[in-house]
Amino acid sequence: MGHFTEEDKATITSLWGKVNVEDVGGETLGRLLVVYPWTQRFFDSFGNLSSASAIMGNPKVKAHGKKVLTSLGGAIKNLDDLKGTFAQLSELHCDKLHVDPENFRLLGNVLVTVLAIHFGKEFTPEVQASWQKMVAGVASALSSRYH
């Protein structure tokens, strides 16, 4: 897992303070389900996922996206212990939900894309580098329970 410099932490925390968890979370999960349709199988209970517009307008997708991003907010407060922060979620996604750990990497990359869209010029290459390191760390932590 990557080591976070003080600069990384400041960069991540600064942008995070401006993130609308509901909007960015819903858009991130929605885009994951549209761009990588095989991920939809984990969300059978979410109802209509038949088209991009159905997915992006689905209230359950938005609600779960917010939940995902809220948990990410907890990680941002504990960047030096991502594995510990995500131990229970890793266990849930591995043992109970059987989610392919590759999906965590995909979700992280989609989040970076959504942040770039939302923050435009403010999302500089340096900011992206810190966020890529963070989403890679989170994906690794969430995958830690897998054998």
UniProtKB/Swiss-Prot annotation:
CDD domains: Hb-beta-like (cd08925)
Keyword field contains DNA-binding: no
GO terms assigned for molecular function: haptoglobin binding; heme binding; hemoglobin alpha binding; metal ion binding; organic acid binding; oxygen binding; oxygen carrier activity; peroxidase activity
PROSITE patterns, per the entry: GLOBIN
Record domain Globin: where: 3-147
Assigned keywords, A-Z: Acetylation, Heme, Iron, Metal-binding, Oxygen transport, Phosphoprotein, S-nitrosylation, Transport
Stored Pfam families: Globin
Annotated positions of the Phosphoserine modification: S45, S51, S53, S140, S143, S144
Positions carrying S-nitrosocysteine: C94
Gene Ontology biological process terms, A to Z: hydrogen peroxide catabolic process
Residues modified as Phosphothreonine: T13
Any single Gene Ontology cellular-component annotation: hemoglobin complex
Residue numbers of N6-acetyllysine PTMs: K60, K83
Residues annotated for heme b binding in this entry: H64, H93
UniProt note on tissues of expression: Red blood cells.
Family membership noted in the UniProt record: Belongs to the globin family.
Subunit structure and binding partners: Heterotetramer of two alpha chains and two gamma chains in fetal hemoglobin (Hb F).
PANTHER family assigned to the protein according to its UniProt record, in alphabetical order: HEMOGLOBIN FAMILY MEMBER, HEMOGLOBIN SUBUNIT GAMMA-1
Task performed by this protein: Gamma chains make up the fetal hemoglobin F, in combination with alpha chains.
Name the UniProt record assigns to this protein: Hemoglobin subunit gamma-2
Organism from which the protein derives: Hylobates lar (Lar gibbon)
Gene designation: HBG2
